[in-house]
Curated annotation (Swiss-Prot):
Broad class of where this protein is predominantly found: cytoplasm
Pathway named in the protein's UniProt entry: Amino-acid biosynthesis; L-serine biosynthesis; L-serine from 3-phospho-D-glycerate: step 2/3; Cofactor biosynthesis; pyridoxine 5'-phosphate biosynthesis; pyridoxine 5'-phosphate from D-erythrose 4-phosphate: step 3/5
In-chain residues carrying the UniProt-annotated modification N6-(pyridoxal phosphate)lysine: K196
Catalytic activity as recorded in UniProt: O-phospho-L-serine + 2-oxoglutarate = 3-phosphooxypyruvate + L-glutamate; 4-(phosphooxy)-L-threonine + 2-oxoglutarate = (R)-3-hydroxy-2-oxo-4-phosphooxybutanoate + L-glutamate
Protein name: Phosphoserine aminotransferase
């Protein structure tokens, strides 16, 4: 079988080593004679999976003991609603930093529950898309929390700093979680859809500080109430067990590779390889300022956009899949999450070089 590299923004690549292990034990997991998909979420076998996966995630992220880890349904869009319903308390506003498509989507959802202070933090620097430094963000005094999306997957824009504030910081880390070390103690809530760096779609991770529990609005659906989910240990209803199990296998894989510092070095090398090639080319362009380029999602444009379809068709034939940019911005996009090996990025660069030579 021809080697295929999947550059999809999500659902994204899952580590080949993990997929192989899952395949081998799919129909007879742990000698039970059944699949892990078929066992009760309350069985001792699955409870052991749940306990170990949380333990491994806590170790990877160095999560302090005063934070709870939840394994939920609903994706990041579910959290767009859950966050204000859980954290507003008696307040009627929260600060929402608008850095792109996903932040804007969170703001639109928040308007159902409060009057968000939406702050446009985008700017232009040296003719490129950029983000204002966090010290220049306009925060309000009466906000219940500060929400932002550190990595906008569509535009390929990443925010690298945090604001100085005494309000809880809430971050949508769907596309960057586990890609490098972070200081969890600087956040009030972290949430992430699983389908980029954690595992298959259907699972959502929420990390919430203990003092933020108990503020939920009375009308909040129980399935979104952080306090209920903490009390029930993420098993208020049947959780996405297969996605949870597979996430646990990804956590083990990350630990075997050396943890998040090792993953950071791996991801830095991939991004450097791709961006250096684009910057050295007169045929391709990236329109994001170097200070805010995403390490996970690298959009690029051909100087001859009429060749886009040809590029995508030939790339696909070469085993380089899902490189089409988001419909909002067009062009191309290479999502190079944790599971993408540097060999995949090298294969992409080699193809891009050959395509340029033939079509410049």
């Amino acid at each position: 079988m021809e080697k295929v590299y999947n550059f999809c923004a999500g659902p994204a690549m899952i580590p080949a080593e993990v997929l192989k292990k899952v395949q081998e034990e799919l129909v007879n997991w742990n000698g039970l004679g059944t699949s892990v998909m078929e066992i009760s979420h309350r069985s001792k076998e699955f409870l052991a999976v749940a306990k170990q996966s949380e333990k491994d995630l806590r170790e990877l992220l160095s999560i302090p003991s005063n934070y709870h880890v939840l394994f939920c349904h609903g994706g990041a869009r579910g959290q767009f609603a859950a966050v204000p319903m859980n954290l507003l308390g008696d307040a009627n506003t929260a600060d929402y930093m608008d850095g792109g498509y996903w932040a804007h989507s969170a703001i639109a959802e928040a308007k159902k529950y409060c009057s968000p202070n939406a702050v446009d933090i985008t700017c232009e620097r040296e003719g490129k898309k950029a983000i204002l430094p966090a010290r220049e963000w306009s925060l309000s005094d009466d906000a219940a929390f500060v929400h932002f999306c550190p990595n906008e997957t569509i535009d390929g824009i990443e925010i690298r700093d945090l604001p100085e504030t005494d309000k809880p910081i809430v971050a949508d880390l769907s596309s960057t979680i586990l890609s490098r070390p972070i200081d969890v103690s600087k956040y009030g809530v972290i949430y992430a859809g699983a389908q980029k760096n954690i595992g298959p779609a259907g699972l959502t991770i929420v990390i919430v500080r203990d003092d933020l529990l108990g503020k939920a609005k009375q009308e909040i659906p129980s399935i979104f109430d952080y306090t209920v989910l903490v009390d029930k240990e993420s098993m208020f209803n049947t959780p996405p067990t297969f996605a949870w199990y597979l996430a646990g296998e990804v956590f083990k894989w990350l630990k075997e590779l050396g943890g998040l510092e090792a993953m950071k070095q791996r991801n830095d090398a991939k991004a450097e390889l791709l961006y250096n090639f684009i910057d050295g080319s007169n045929f391709y362009n990236n329109d994001v300022h170097v200070d805010n380029r995403s390490f996970m999602n690298a959009p690029f444009q051909l100087k001859k956009p009429e060749l886009d379809s040809k590029f995508l068709e030939q790339a696909d034939a070469a085993g380089l899949k899902a490189l089409k940019g988001h419909r909002v911005v067009g062009g191309m996009r290479a999502s190079i999450y944790n599971a993408m090996p540097i060999e995949g990025v090298q294969a992409l660069v080699d193809f891009m070089r050959q395509f340029e030579q033939k079509n410049a």
